[in-house]
Swiss-Prot record:
Assigned keywords, A-Z: Hydrolase
Species name: Listeria monocytogenes serotype 4b (strain F2365)
Pfam families in alphabetical order: Lactamase_B_2
Upper classification of the organism: Bacteria, Bacillati, Bacillota, Bacilli, Bacillales
Name listed for the protein in its UniProt record: UPF0173 metal-dependent hydrolase LMOf2365_1599
GO terms of molecular function: hydrolase activity
Family to which the UniProt record says this protein belongs: Belongs to the UPF0173 family.
Amino acid sequence: MKISFHGQSCIKIITGDTTILVDPFISGNDKCDLKAEEQMPDFIVLSHGHDDHVGDTVEIAKNSGATVICNADLASFLAVEDGLENIAPMHIGGKRQFSFGQVKLTQAFHGSQTVRDGRIVNLGFPTGIVFTIEDKNIYFAGDTGLFSDMKLIGELNPLDVAFLPIGDNFTMGPEDAAIAARFLQAKLVVPMHYNTFPLIAQDPHKFVASLDEGITGKVLEIGEGIEI
């Protein structure tokens, strides 16, 4: 399995002949190396409804026929407002089997809304995501602050990789993300959600260097991937 990073919180997972896009913020993101019109994933997974995470989901899903996995409130909005048909609604605490493996939604401390036609639309609770693919557990924290139940996430799902936001202001900053890494005890920690715009400017290498002894961190450059 290969996992690649494409700026902000967009990652791509390739397992066998299946491609999964997570939070595909591509258009309008000069930190992303992908082109929305070229993406043909089998699945799109969304952590929450903010525009820098939903991104190009509607266009990509309609072009590719991808199944969109997300919280049920966001799923309803995408179906009714944007005409998406292939949607797998879930909620926090639930897990579901798909052709590529299992998805489980966890809590995240953040918001989830958009503005449509001048009105603010709340899109359910934000989530983190635990993927179990090829007997590996991948935790994608989404946008979140630090919370102590991250310890429980790591205990229940021994983690091979954890993707953690470090941008501060809207999410955890580097200091809290380092504590999150301690709580989770993943084999590998990868920072995300930083340097997309000035308000979340951070030094990811400094974050990795700050991790506790015994915790391995890796900065993925845009388009770079890891094999697990």
